[in-house]
Every structure is written in structure tokens, then in C-alpha cells.
Amino acid sequence: HAFCLEQREDLKWPASMYLEGSDQHRGWFHSSLLESSGTRGKAPYESVLTHGFVVDGRGRKMSKSLGNVISPDDILKKYGVDILRLWVVASDYYDDLKLDNAILQSQAESYRRIRNTFRFLIGNLNDFTKEEAIDESEFPELEKYLLHRLWEVDQVVQKCVSTFNFHLMFTTLLNFCSSDLSAFYFDIRKDTIYCDSKESVQRRSTRTLLNIIFNHLVRWF
């Protein structure tokens, strides 16, 4: 902190957060706190966030002797960078982060569900304009219920972001996409979208809500 934060005008001291592995409780976190408190009378950070270490699917340390090391390059070649990112955000970093091919395959399935949710939304919002939108007060009961569920999810997401609980945030969003949307709302309103007239209140309400959901999901993800 003395050679970085205090020497650069574009950075502030104390740091808003120190982020490191659990081994740094007696290392960097501790030594920085002692030095800064002794020379400046104040901690060099406002908060500390600790994460676990990457281990294999059985919770063992990765090593060449065990033959359980998974190279990031191999993951990128087989699954792509988005699956690796998804694994990171879906992992509960308060504990060690388990990683193997079965876990990555599970995240690939989660990615497929999220992608299909966006595909449905984009495909059924073609040519949607603000003139077609209908006031939320005129929504049918089903749309009002989904609007309430959207609000509930947003409350969880905001709290998770402020507390860095990305694991719960991702689980909440995945369940919302899979259960509330794909398995429930989308399935019910398919006939409305495909069969009702463009001027019908129910179809306009459905498309208005789909637009609201889409904009929320884009911000959340």
C-alpha cells in the first residue's frame, strides 16, 4: 500500500478491499495491518475478502503426482471462456473451489439453460416498440405475479452484489431462468405469443413483460 496506493494519484488510500487466499490471514493481511497501524495509526484497507483454493472434484490438492491437474488452456479449448467464467461465479469461494470435468459439464448445462432463455426472449421481442408496450397496471394476474417475482429476484441480486455473495446470486438467477421462466411462464404464454392477435391486451402484456425481463437479465448477467 505504501508503494502503490500512496504513490499514485489515481488510487486512494486506504484500499477499499484486500482480496487474497486464506493463507494470507497470517501473511499479507496481517503484515500490512501491523505496518500500517504502527506507522499511520490506521488499517490500510476498509475490508478483507478471503477465498479458498482450487482443488479437484474430490477436494484434493491438485498435483502432478496425483495426475489431477486441469490446465486452464485445456478448459478453454474444450468448453470456452464463458464456461470457465460461469464456474468461477457459481463457486462458493468461502470454501475451496472444486474443479473437474463433471463439474465443468454441469456448468456447460447451466450455460445452455441461460442461453436458451435469452434466445426465447430475443426471438419473441422481434419488432417490439414502446408503442406496443402496455402499462403494468393493466397486466393480467400472471404477468403481475411474474413482475413481483422479478422484484424479489432483484432484491436478492442487489444484496448479493453488496455482500460479494456471487454464488447465491448465480443460483438465484439460474433458478429464475429455469423454473420461473422456461418451465413456467414461457410454457404458458407460448400460445399467446404465437396465436393471439398483435393488438390483444394479453399478447401486448406478455411482450411488454418479456422486454422488462430481458433488460433485467442483461443487467444482472
Each language-model region and where it sits:
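Structured secondary-structure scaffolds
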Residues: 1-127, 146-189, 193-194, 209-219
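Short His/Asp/Glu-rich catalytic/ion-coordination signatures at enzyme active sites or charged loops
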Residues: 133-143, 153-158
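Acidic, serine/threonine/proline-rich low-complexity intrinsically disordered regions
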Residues: 198-199
